[in-house]
Amino acid sequence: QVGGNWCPWCLRFADFVEKDTAVNKAVNDNFVYLHVNYNPRKKEGDASVEKAAQLMKRLNYPQRFGFPVFVVLDENGNVLHIQDSSFLEQGKGYDEQKTLRFLKNWTPKAVK
């Protein structure tokens, strides 16, 4: 998950994964789930800005979809899919069935 602690929707998704039993199980059983705290507002000259730019390039610029954005990598670190989170939303939160469908479609078993 690429986003940041400045992003309400990023925090909502992290909370959703933690509290929704089915989603939590799907994530923990099939993925190494990492949070990338990306801050597009940081100023040039900050050492973390260059590192963040390099990471976003390596991940095929997922920030173009907004935040949060989900990047699925294979076991070698190659980008398989970038998911815009808006397709998983419902109201002021996230939809369990849409999220489970997304996760199921990108499990290691599904992509082999």
Segments predicted by a language model, with ranges:
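Thiol-based oxidoreductase modules, predominantly thioredoxin-like and allied folds used
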Residues: N24-E50
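N-terminal post-signal-peptidase region of extra-cytosolic proteins
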Residues: K19, A52-K57
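Chalcogenol-based redox active-site neighborhoods
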Residues: D15, R41-K43, L59-Y61
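Short pre-active-site segment immediately N-terminal to redox-active cysteine/selenocysteine motifs
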Residues: G3-W6
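Extracytoplasmic/secreted cell-surface and envelope-processing proteins
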Residues: P8-C10, K43-G45, L80-I82
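Typically the conserved alpha-helix immediately C-terminal to a functionally engaged Cys/Sec
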Residues: L11-A26
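Non-catalytic, surface beta->alpha helical segment in thiol-disulfide oxidoreductase systems
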Residues: R58, R64-V111
